[in-house]
């Protein structure tokens, strides 16, 4: 398992570089889900590749975020983790650049079918402009997936981050 950010390097700069380098699956550990999603939306906009941005959680299912106005449209019948991964696999036929942010996927990642699907997707997505980003407060990564998923620890915001977010 490649674990990133044990130093003071900007983790969001690292994530942007990883997306440019076609890293297929990232696992971000943080307690600040909204902040992480907002930063990921900013990265998607900065990469200027017309990314389609999707968000999934086990309560709301899969939604597509409009990067221009921030609205989200939920897709029907994609609530279960296996359905979600099958949907992502089916999208490799399309040429669109896509980011899928999965909240709290650690609850499902140890299930046999999920492990196999994630491994297969990690092997497949590296040839496309599609990325899965797991965002969770808990690092729970099965040994079988350690080679395929890059872990990035997102630190709590520092003084500079807090000052810049309060400046209008």
Please provide the spans of the model-predicted regions.
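ATP/nucleotide-binding catalytic cores
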Residues: 2-168
